[in-house]
Amino acid sequence: MADAWDIKSLKTKRNTLREKLEKRKKERIEILSDIQEDLTNPKKELVEADLEVQKEVLQALSSCSLALPIVSTQVVEKIAGSSLEMVNFILGKLANQGAIVIRNVTIGTEAGCEIISVQPKELKEILEDTNDTCQQKEEEAKRKLEVDDVDQPQEKTIKLESTVARKESTSLDAPDDIMMLLSMPSTREKQSKQVGEEILELLTKPTAKERSVAEKFKSHGGAQVMEFCSHGTKVECLKAQQATAEMAAKKKQERRDEKELRPDVDAGENVTGKVPKTESAAEDGEIIAEVINNCEAESQESTDGSDTCSSETTDKCTKLHFKKIIQAHTDESLGDCSFLNTCFHMATCKYVHYEVDTLPHINTNKPTDVKTKLSLKRSVDSSCTLYPPQWIQCDLRFLDMTVLGKFAVVMADPPWDIHMELPYGTMSDDEMRALGVPALQDDGLIFLWVTGRAMELGRDCLKLWGYERVDELIWVKTNQLQRIIRTGRTGHWLNHGKEHCLVGMKGNPTNLNRGLDCDVIVAEVRATSHKPDEIYGIIERLSPGTRKIELFGRPHNIQPNWITLGNQLDGIRLVDPELITQFQKRYPDGNCMSPASANAASINGIQK
């Protein structure tokens, strides 16, 4: 029996020792688990922050208003609570997945990247995946909160749940790490990507021809255009500045008065309102603190606003102003003349007229720098020869236009027979149709100015001359004060404030620069039938360095590289040697103003 009891006591001792060892193991595991939780918590926060930032980055890249290329610093500015390193890491991850194409650049002193192109479909898929992961994490957090709210008497269940959650988190993090390693590009992929980026950089650089074309259309000597002031005269501009200064000072004074009154009101409320020392008192204290902070912010804003207003009002207006022309017979109470500088009776008109108020402090004799000197020396094309203005005084009804050769662009402002008194003669519809315009072009463009009832006649003439109407320009007329004309001299039922220019095409013209200009010209009205000078710039940009001719031109229409024809020009001036020889053969006496001279020239040509 003694042996049996000894065996039993040994077994109990062993069991107690095993229990003690198990308890010690559990204590060690618990201590280690607490340490691991403390270490893993910041990592989880970083992962969650990365997911949120990645979601915002994907939303910013998939937006329709994104302008490419864009630098990573600009993406950081759009996303609150993000750093440049985090955004660069996310962009590199997206580039490895093939959603975007980036290029490494240096932004100031920091290294960054530039987004060149975006794949919308892949970005959409990645955004959906990130949204799903965010939703899963939110659901897990809700479940944990629900579990924490329930009172659990046993500590073992809490420890088991924490261990399970740790295992799940580690099991979730493990495949992410594996996917990260798999998505990392290899050295071969990096080399091929670098080669592709270098090729793309070479392709995006402008060529020498593109740079020369851009240099060609720059203004000689830089931009010399001044903006008109919206207030009109200098007096009105100063009045407006004083009014804004007074308003700013008034607002500043009102804010100061409110700031002085608010402390008294708050003190009175504290004396009369006896609040017990409870949570409500703390809330009132918080509200009072917020009110004081708001007052300080408003006072700071008012000081800033007053400084800006004072700086704005003290600055002089650098825009262009007008000056009233006050004569002995002018009556200012009548107001402005509706025709302004186009008034035919300015010497006796009692209404107010204007002239540009020149600025005496502007130095017109500025030394030209090297860039402007180089821009003045540039030419258009070595292959084409440019000539100074050329013109022929002639009657277009009788001129033999085959002598002139072929042109790339034709512009015509015909004297249409409209029901209106004009300072020049007009042509009938049949005479317009019989003009020799088809001989001027085989392939090219025509710009035909039309007005009133001549719009339909102009379309008929284009068809008859062999053109197809492809576009239309509109000239919106403004007066001297840069306002839209409301009392025009044309129009039977409504005052016309615009004119139309039909654009026709013949054949298949080449070397046209499409899409450079708009089809609307907003320009000031000058003399009768004086078209805006902007049309010449539009035509030159559309077809640079080519032969151009203008029909029914006047002395103010002569332009370099243009031949102008009209009966109001001063004689004949030709520079092109080929054109001179052809014209002298056809018109030896140089007279092409009458049908008799044209017939005599044709008879002489037949006899020779």
Curated annotation (Swiss-Prot):
The keyword Lipid biosynthesis does not apply. Keywords: Differentiation, Methyltransferase, mRNA processing, mRNA splicing, Nucleus, RNA-binding, S-adenosyl-L-methionine, Sexual differentiation, Transferase. Changing residue 413 to A: Severe lethality. Pfam families: MT-A70. Residues 250-265 have a biased composition (Basic and acidic residues). Residues 250-272 are annotated as: Disordered. GO terms for cellular component: nucleus; RNA N6-methyladenosine methyltransferase complex. Its main location: nucleus. GO terms for molecular function: mRNA m(6)A methyltransferase activity; RNA binding. Catalytic component of the WMM complex, a complex that mediates N6-methyladenosine (m6A) methylation of mRNAs, a modification that plays a role in the efficiency of mRNA splicing and is required for sex determination. In the heterodimer formed with Mettl14, constitutes the catalytic core. Required for sex determination and dosage compensation via Sxl alternative splicing: m6A methylation acts as a key regulator of Sxl pre-mRNA and promotes female-specific alternative splicing of Sxl, which determines female physiognomy. M6A methylation is also required for neuronal functions. Component of the WMM complex, a N6-methyltransferase complex composed of a catalytic subcomplex, named MAC, and of an associated subcomplex, named MACOM. The MAC subcomplex is composed of Ime4/Mettl3 and Mettl14. The MACOM subcomplex is composed of fl(2)d, Flacc/Xio, Hakai, vir, and, in some cases of nito. Belongs to the MT-A70-like family. This is N(6)-adenosine-methyltransferase MT-A70-like protein. The lineage of its organism: Eukaryota, Metazoa, Ecdysozoa, Arthropoda, Hexapoda.
